[in-house]
Regions:
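PP2C/PPM-type serine/threonine phosphatase catalytic domain
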Residues: 1-300
Length: 300
Protein backbone atom coordinates (compact mmCIF):
# COMPACT_ATOMS: atom_id res chain seq x y z
CA UNK A 1 0.00 0.00 0.00
CA UNK A 2 1.36 3.45 -0.87
CA UNK A 3 0.70 7.12 -0.47
CA UNK A 4 -1.46 7.23 -3.60
CA UNK A 5 -4.21 5.81 -1.39
CA UNK A 6 -4.21 8.94 0.74
CA UNK A 7 -7.75 10.33 1.15
CA UNK A 8 -6.80 13.91 2.04
CA UNK A 9 -4.31 15.96 4.01
CA UNK A 10 -5.27 19.25 5.58
CA UNK A 11 -3.04 21.44 7.70
CA UNK A 12 -3.81 24.38 9.92
CA UNK A 13 -0.91 26.58 10.97
CA UNK A 14 2.76 25.80 10.66
CA UNK A 15 5.01 23.42 12.53
CA UNK A 16 7.43 24.95 15.00
CA UNK A 17 10.76 26.04 13.57
CA UNK A 18 13.24 23.32 14.59
CA UNK A 19 15.84 25.92 15.54
CA UNK A 20 13.49 28.12 17.57
CA UNK A 21 13.42 28.12 21.36
CA UNK A 22 11.37 25.28 22.86
CA UNK A 23 7.80 26.07 23.88
CA UNK A 24 6.43 25.65 27.37
CA UNK A 25 5.71 22.08 28.50
CA UNK A 26 2.74 20.39 26.86
CA UNK A 27 0.21 18.81 29.25
CA UNK A 28 -2.82 16.73 28.26
CA UNK A 29 -5.57 15.64 30.65
CA UNK A 30 -7.89 13.09 29.06
CA UNK A 31 -10.67 10.60 29.72
CA UNK A 32 -12.72 8.13 27.70
CA UNK A 33 -16.11 6.52 28.26
CA UNK A 34 -18.18 3.98 26.32
CA UNK A 35 -21.78 2.91 26.91
CA UNK A 36 -24.02 0.29 25.31
CA UNK A 37 -26.87 2.77 24.95
CA UNK A 38 -30.59 2.12 25.44
CA UNK A 39 -31.32 -0.19 22.50
CA UNK A 40 -28.34 -2.38 21.60
CA UNK A 41 -27.73 -5.65 23.47
CA UNK A 42 -23.93 -5.38 23.18
CA UNK A 43 -21.27 -2.72 22.76
CA UNK A 44 -19.34 -2.86 19.47
CA UNK A 45 -17.43 0.36 20.16
CA UNK A 46 -13.82 0.23 21.34
CA UNK A 47 -11.66 3.11 22.55
CA UNK A 48 -8.17 3.73 23.88
CA UNK A 49 -6.63 6.66 25.75
CA UNK A 50 -2.87 6.18 26.05
CA UNK A 51 0.52 7.84 26.41
CA UNK A 52 3.61 7.01 24.40
CA UNK A 53 6.67 7.39 26.61
CA UNK A 54 10.36 6.69 26.40
CA UNK A 55 11.71 5.31 29.68
CA UNK A 56 15.03 4.10 31.06
CA UNK A 57 14.95 2.37 34.45
CA UNK A 58 18.24 2.19 36.35
CA UNK A 59 18.33 -0.80 38.73
CA UNK A 60 22.00 -0.70 39.79
CA UNK A 61 24.80 1.78 39.18
CA UNK A 62 27.99 3.06 40.82
CA UNK A 63 27.25 6.55 39.56
CA UNK A 64 26.39 8.97 42.38
CA UNK A 65 22.77 10.05 42.68
CA UNK A 66 21.55 7.88 39.83
CA UNK A 67 17.86 8.35 39.26
CA UNK A 68 15.64 5.30 39.28
CA UNK A 69 13.81 6.32 36.13
CA UNK A 70 14.47 8.68 33.25
CA UNK A 71 11.26 9.25 31.32
CA UNK A 72 10.33 11.46 28.39
CA UNK A 73 6.72 11.85 27.33
CA UNK A 74 6.46 11.34 23.57
CA UNK A 75 2.80 11.77 22.84
CA UNK A 76 -0.83 11.12 23.68
CA UNK A 77 -2.83 8.66 21.58
CA UNK A 78 -6.62 8.49 21.28
CA UNK A 79 -8.55 5.84 19.33
CA UNK A 80 -12.26 5.27 18.68
CA UNK A 81 -13.50 2.31 16.64
CA UNK A 82 -17.14 1.49 15.91
CA UNK A 83 -17.73 -2.06 14.71
CA UNK A 84 -19.87 -2.38 11.60
CA UNK A 85 -22.36 -5.14 11.03
CA UNK A 86 -24.61 -5.16 14.08
CA UNK A 87 -23.40 -8.61 15.09
CA UNK A 88 -20.64 -10.20 17.14
CA UNK A 89 -18.33 -9.69 14.15
CA UNK A 90 -18.54 -5.91 14.56
CA UNK A 91 -17.27 -6.17 18.11
CA UNK A 92 -14.46 -8.46 16.94
CA UNK A 93 -13.48 -6.05 14.15
CA UNK A 94 -13.25 -2.97 16.37
CA UNK A 95 -11.32 -4.82 19.07
CA UNK A 96 -8.87 -6.43 16.66
CA UNK A 97 -8.21 -3.16 14.87
CA UNK A 98 -7.55 -1.19 18.04
CA UNK A 99 -5.17 -3.84 19.40
CA UNK A 100 -3.36 -4.05 16.07
CA UNK A 101 -2.90 -0.29 15.90
CA UNK A 102 -1.68 -0.18 19.51
CA UNK A 103 1.03 -2.69 18.64
CA UNK A 104 1.94 -0.91 15.42
CA UNK A 105 2.32 2.48 17.10
CA UNK A 106 4.37 1.05 19.95
CA UNK A 107 6.84 -0.48 17.51
CA UNK A 108 6.83 2.27 14.89
CA UNK A 109 6.47 5.73 16.42
CA UNK A 110 10.03 6.30 17.53
CA UNK A 111 9.80 10.08 17.58
CA UNK A 112 10.95 12.30 20.40
CA UNK A 113 8.68 14.77 22.16
CA UNK A 114 10.71 17.64 20.65
CA UNK A 115 8.96 17.30 17.30
CA UNK A 116 10.83 18.67 14.30
CA UNK A 117 9.06 20.05 11.23
CA UNK A 118 10.82 17.50 9.05
CA UNK A 119 9.25 14.64 11.03
CA UNK A 120 5.61 15.54 10.39
CA UNK A 121 5.19 13.75 7.08
CA UNK A 122 6.80 10.67 8.61
CA UNK A 123 4.30 10.67 11.47
CA UNK A 124 1.37 11.04 9.08
CA UNK A 125 2.78 8.19 7.01
CA UNK A 126 3.08 6.04 10.14
CA UNK A 127 -0.53 6.71 11.11
CA UNK A 128 -1.67 5.94 7.58
CA UNK A 129 0.27 2.67 7.59
CA UNK A 130 -1.28 1.77 10.93
CA UNK A 131 -4.73 1.88 9.30
CA UNK A 132 -3.49 -0.09 6.28
CA UNK A 133 -2.03 -2.82 8.49
CA UNK A 134 -5.15 -3.08 10.64
CA UNK A 135 -7.28 -3.33 7.49
CA UNK A 136 -5.13 -6.17 6.14
CA UNK A 137 -5.28 -7.96 9.50
CA UNK A 138 -9.09 -8.06 9.42
CA UNK A 139 -9.08 -9.82 6.05
CA UNK A 140 -6.54 -12.32 7.39
CA UNK A 141 -8.87 -13.08 10.29
CA UNK A 142 -11.82 -13.57 7.94
CA UNK A 143 -9.86 -16.21 6.03
CA UNK A 144 -9.38 -18.09 9.30
CA UNK A 145 -12.96 -17.45 10.48
CA UNK A 146 -15.37 -17.41 7.51
CA UNK A 147 -18.27 -16.74 9.87
CA UNK A 148 -16.86 -13.22 10.29
CA UNK A 149 -17.15 -12.46 6.58
CA UNK A 150 -17.91 -8.78 6.01
CA UNK A 151 -16.88 -7.58 9.46
CA UNK A 152 -15.52 -4.07 9.56
CA UNK A 153 -14.99 -1.03 11.73
CA UNK A 154 -14.62 2.71 11.61
CA UNK A 155 -11.37 4.04 13.06
CA UNK A 156 -10.59 7.57 14.21
CA UNK A 157 -7.17 8.12 15.75
CA UNK A 158 -5.43 11.22 17.08
CA UNK A 159 -1.84 11.73 18.22
CA UNK A 160 -1.05 14.88 20.23
CA UNK A 161 2.63 15.70 20.61
CA UNK A 162 4.53 18.93 21.28
CA UNK A 163 1.59 21.25 20.53
CA UNK A 164 0.75 19.46 17.28
CA UNK A 165 -2.19 17.18 16.50
CA UNK A 166 -2.14 14.39 13.91
CA UNK A 167 -5.36 12.65 12.89
CA UNK A 168 -5.98 9.50 10.83
CA UNK A 169 -9.55 8.56 10.05
CA UNK A 170 -11.84 6.18 8.18
CA UNK A 171 -15.60 5.89 8.60
CA UNK A 172 -18.21 8.02 10.36
CA UNK A 173 -16.81 8.34 13.85
CA UNK A 174 -15.54 11.87 14.36
CA UNK A 175 -12.74 14.03 15.73
CA UNK A 176 -13.63 17.54 16.87
CA UNK A 177 -11.58 20.50 18.08
CA UNK A 178 -13.23 22.88 20.54
CA UNK A 179 -11.20 26.08 20.56
CA UNK A 180 -12.10 29.69 21.39
CA UNK A 181 -15.73 28.71 21.98
CA UNK A 182 -16.06 27.15 18.52
CA UNK A 183 -16.61 23.47 17.71
CA UNK A 184 -14.90 22.34 14.51
CA UNK A 185 -15.32 18.89 12.97
CA UNK A 186 -11.84 17.95 11.76
CA UNK A 187 -12.80 14.71 10.00
CA UNK A 188 -15.23 14.03 7.16
CA UNK A 189 -17.99 11.44 7.43
CA UNK A 190 -17.32 8.64 4.97
CA UNK A 191 -20.97 7.90 4.24
CA UNK A 192 -23.11 7.88 1.13
CA UNK A 193 -25.15 10.86 2.35
CA UNK A 194 -22.03 12.90 3.18
CA UNK A 195 -20.61 12.15 -0.25
CA UNK A 196 -23.86 13.36 -1.82
CA UNK A 197 -23.46 16.63 0.08
CA UNK A 198 -19.85 17.00 -1.12
CA UNK A 199 -21.05 16.46 -4.70
CA UNK A 200 -23.91 18.94 -4.14
CA UNK A 201 -26.56 16.34 -4.89
CA UNK A 202 -28.32 17.10 -1.61
CA UNK A 203 -28.14 20.12 0.70
CA UNK A 204 -26.10 19.88 3.93
CA UNK A 205 -29.24 20.23 6.05
CA UNK A 206 -30.77 17.19 4.32
CA UNK A 207 -27.95 14.89 5.40
CA UNK A 208 -29.09 14.63 9.02
CA UNK A 209 -32.23 12.65 8.16
CA UNK A 210 -31.22 11.12 4.83
CA UNK A 211 -31.84 7.33 4.66
CA UNK A 212 -28.27 6.80 3.41
CA UNK A 213 -26.59 8.64 6.27
CA UNK A 214 -25.64 5.30 7.85
CA UNK A 215 -24.27 3.74 4.64
CA UNK A 216 -20.53 3.85 5.39
CA UNK A 217 -18.34 3.96 2.28
CA UNK A 218 -14.84 3.68 3.77
CA UNK A 219 -13.97 1.40 6.69
CA UNK A 220 -11.36 -1.07 7.86
CA UNK A 221 -12.39 -4.53 6.71
CA UNK A 222 -15.86 -4.86 5.25
CA UNK A 223 -16.47 -6.40 1.85
CA UNK A 224 -13.67 -4.68 -0.11
CA UNK A 225 -9.97 -4.30 0.59
CA UNK A 226 -8.32 -0.91 0.46
CA UNK A 227 -9.22 1.49 3.27
CA UNK A 228 -8.50 5.13 2.43
CA UNK A 229 -6.81 7.08 5.23
CA UNK A 230 -7.97 10.66 5.73
CA UNK A 231 -5.11 12.57 7.38
CA UNK A 232 -4.86 15.94 9.11
CA UNK A 233 -2.28 17.91 11.05
CA UNK A 234 -2.72 21.18 12.92
CA UNK A 235 -1.50 23.33 15.80
CA UNK A 236 -2.84 22.99 19.32
CA UNK A 237 -3.14 25.79 21.87
CA UNK A 238 -3.56 25.97 25.62
CA UNK A 239 -7.23 25.61 26.52
CA UNK A 240 -8.16 23.54 23.46
CA UNK A 241 -10.41 20.51 23.90
CA UNK A 242 -10.38 17.46 21.65
CA UNK A 243 -13.39 15.20 21.24
CA UNK A 244 -13.28 11.81 19.53
CA UNK A 245 -16.61 10.01 19.38
CA UNK A 246 -18.67 7.35 17.67
CA UNK A 247 -21.83 8.22 15.75
CA UNK A 248 -23.88 7.00 18.70
CA UNK A 249 -23.13 10.40 20.23
CA UNK A 250 -23.50 12.64 17.19
CA UNK A 251 -26.70 10.94 15.99
CA UNK A 252 -28.36 11.74 19.32
CA UNK A 253 -26.82 15.03 20.45
CA UNK A 254 -26.72 18.07 18.12
CA UNK A 255 -23.44 19.92 17.76
CA UNK A 256 -24.65 23.04 19.55
CA UNK A 257 -25.42 20.93 22.62
CA UNK A 258 -22.05 19.17 22.37
CA UNK A 259 -20.37 22.58 22.26
CA UNK A 260 -22.37 23.77 25.27
CA UNK A 261 -21.28 20.75 27.32
CA UNK A 262 -17.63 21.22 26.37
CA UNK A 263 -17.88 24.91 27.27
CA UNK A 264 -19.32 24.04 30.70
CA UNK A 265 -17.00 21.11 31.45
CA UNK A 266 -13.26 21.48 30.87
CA UNK A 267 -12.74 18.41 33.09
CA UNK A 268 -12.52 15.50 30.62
CA UNK A 269 -14.24 12.94 32.86
CA UNK A 270 -17.19 15.18 33.63
CA UNK A 271 -17.47 16.15 29.96
CA UNK A 272 -17.56 12.50 28.85
CA UNK A 273 -20.11 11.59 31.49
CA UNK A 274 -22.40 14.43 30.47
CA UNK A 275 -22.07 13.72 26.75
CA UNK A 276 -22.93 10.03 27.18
CA UNK A 277 -25.77 10.82 29.57
CA UNK A 278 -27.22 13.33 27.10
CA UNK A 279 -27.11 10.77 24.27
CA UNK A 280 -28.91 8.23 26.45
CA UNK A 281 -31.44 10.84 27.55
CA UNK A 282 -32.28 11.49 23.90
CA UNK A 283 -32.85 7.80 23.13
CA UNK A 284 -29.44 6.11 23.12
CA UNK A 285 -30.21 4.27 19.87
CA UNK A 286 -26.61 3.11 19.33
CA UNK A 287 -23.46 2.45 21.33
CA UNK A 288 -22.00 5.72 22.61
CA UNK A 289 -18.29 6.46 22.97
CA UNK A 290 -16.58 9.75 23.80
CA UNK A 291 -12.97 10.73 24.48
CA UNK A 292 -12.24 14.25 25.69
CA UNK A 293 -8.72 15.67 26.03
CA UNK A 294 -7.89 19.06 27.56
CA UNK A 295 -4.70 20.72 26.31
CA UNK A 296 -2.84 22.71 28.96
CA UNK A 297 0.36 24.68 29.24
CA UNK A 298 2.69 23.53 31.98
CA UNK A 299 5.24 25.45 33.99
CA UNK A 300 8.24 26.57 31.90
Amino acid sequence: MNLSRLFSVKSKGQAADPVSAPRSPFIVNSFGLSDRGQIRSSNEDCFVVAELTRTLQVHHSNLPQSKATFSCNRGHVFLVADGVGGSKAGEVASGLSVRNIEEFLLNTLKRSSNLQASEEQGILRDLQNALFQADARLFEEVRAHPEWQGMGTTLTMALAVNWRLFVAHAGDSRCYLYSEKKLQQLTHDHTMAAEMVRRRIIAPQDQEHHPWRHVVTNILGGTERGVQAELHSLDLHAGDLLLLCSDGLTEMVPEDQIAAILEDESDPQRACERLVAEANKRGGKDNITAIVAHIKQGEP
